[in-house]
Amino acid sequence: MIRAIFGGTFDPIHNGHLQTAAALVKELGISTLALMPSAVPPHRPQPDASPEQRLDMVKLASQYHKAFTVEDWELRQDRPSFTANTLSEFKTQFPDDTLLFVMGMDSLMSLHRWHHWCQLIECAHLVVMPRAGVPFNPKNDELKEFISVHLTRDKNALNTQSQGLLYIAETPMVDVSATELRKQLQQREKNLPLPSNVYNYIRQHQLYL
């Protein structure tokens, strides 16, 4: 079984996340894609919304596509959410499944700064979605070597081995930035790239003001 996980801060989750994720579901022909908000990203500033609020927004956004599900494993842990630990735990829980960990190109380009980053590929395939303004051009030598060893252009290869591959998806580059979106919400702008139910939740709870 393919178990695909799209991890992110989702502060807030927006149409850019959802449109590219829906395109990935179609490209890979997977039946489900779990949206997993991270708990306390150790290498990034703390999210503006609480873990509970981010989870609520992800649950609302999951209605966007029938393949989307919600995974709250990291939010249920009483420790920082290192992706290497999460994938290792999932591999232990689901030893017969093939794990796909989905990330954006910006995450790949900074992957060498992640905790035990080389171990990610020992538990899962990494699937990377292109992002507007972020070229596929690694600067770090270790990361370059990592990519050269694990990169595949064949999406079907993800089904023939259980881990160890890095695949660059052909999903559209939707130019939405959560940072800019939070600024727009603070300025009370309208017609933002958010699902209507997520936008209403943000306004109801007076987030990002």
From Swiss-Prot:
The protein's name in its UniProt record: Probable nicotinate-nucleotide adenylyltransferase
Top-level class of the enzyme under EC nomenclature: transferase
Sequence intervals crossing the membrane: none
EC number: 2.7.7.18
InterPro entries for this protein: Cyt_trans-like, NadD/NMNAT, Rossmann-like_a/b/a_fold
Keyword Transferase: yes
HAMAP family reported in the protein's UniProt record: NaMN_adenylyltr
Family under the similarity heading: Belongs to the NadD family.
Catalysed conversion reaction: nicotinate beta-D-ribonucleotide + ATP + H(+) = deamido-NAD(+) + diphosphate
Domain of life: Bacteria
Pathway: Cofactor biosynthesis; NAD(+) biosynthesis; deamido-NAD(+) from nicotinate D-ribonucleotide: step 1/1
Cystine bridges: none
Biological process terms in GO annotation: NAD biosynthetic process
GO molecular function terms attached to this record: ATP binding; nicotinate-nucleotide adenylyltransferase activity
Keywords tagged on the record: ATP-binding, NAD, Nucleotide-binding, Nucleotidyltransferase, Pyridine nucleotide biosynthesis, Transferase
Keyword Secreted appears in the UniProt entry: no
